[in-house]
Amino acid sequence: MSSEGEFQTDSSDEVDSFKKSTGLDLHEQYMKFHPQVLSDFGEEMEKMWGRKWRANTNVGKLRMVLLHCPGKEFLSVGKPTPWPPHDPSLAAWRMAFKPDLDEMIRDHENLAKAYRDEGVEVLIRKPDTNDPPYQVKAIYTDDVCHPASYGQIILRMYDHVRKREELPTYQTLAEVGCPVVGMIVGNGMAEGGPIGWLDEKHVVVSVHYPRANTQQPAVMRANEFGHEQFARIVKLQDPEVDVRLCPGYGTRLGPSHYALIDRHTSIQDPRSLDPNLVAWMKAEMDWEFIIAPDEVCRTFVTRDERRLVVKRGPETGVVLEPRKVLVPTGEPKARKWLESIGVEVVEVNCPTLVGPMNSGSIHCAAGSIIRDPEPKSY
């Protein structure tokens, strides 16, 4: 089967209806009125795709966020998992509590309202359609798709409990017209937690949470393959972006994009990061690390013999706009300190969705779909 115009422009002994109606045969119409249009995908995105689908920043004003409403998947907790070894324990479901679905939905509604109250458009991911439903970690939407320079990349999840989140995420984005500009394929793996835009020209990528088998050569190569795919997609769009592929086979990277409050500014003790990464951030972006006082810091056990315990500053949650953050309730000292350094703090009550009750943070539960550009005046 030929495409439009492929053979129809060839001369024919038959009556040429194009020539008869317009004075020009089809070939002449192509040549005169229909040249190829040389244009840039990113530059014409708003015209062709309806919106500026860009979120390659973690501090530009948030315009659209992707959330997932807890559903029937949480009723499966306590039953044998649909994946091997088909264990009914809470640990096998990566849960610390038997979920109360009504309570989780209430917390989700609190979170959605908090965004809407700040003028953020809320996009809800399509529900889990597996039989039985099992996607109890789908509330962490930041892990499944991630911004490229424009549009979204569908990532490829690590483990059974998160497999197949990719499809409803893709369908949700497609339904609202958000361009999916790539997917992680083959045996490549990548999750969004440790993929972080530090600004529009710098992004770091590492392993999300190392497992018992992460150090196996085949798994290491699969992780690297996924990271390289992400980097290629980004650099095809914008060759100027510096993508740092960070090693991730022991301690987790202390992700600076989870500690941001403003452009090139994070609440972090740089001694908790790889010194080479710190040197790069300072040299490339003149990065400012603000060290919080001990009384508002959180203590973490790293399982790294070189630094078993680290202190991290108060959670900065989701940056709504520069110097304005959305965080869970419950840390009045941290809020007061953040306000003392000029950060506006918006709080939301959502304990069943975030730590310590659950396995992710409020940042994990927010997929950035549209953000304004970062301020360039400082």
Give residue ranges: language-model regions:
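The feature marks the mature, well-folded catalytic cores of soluble enzymes
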Residues: 2-378
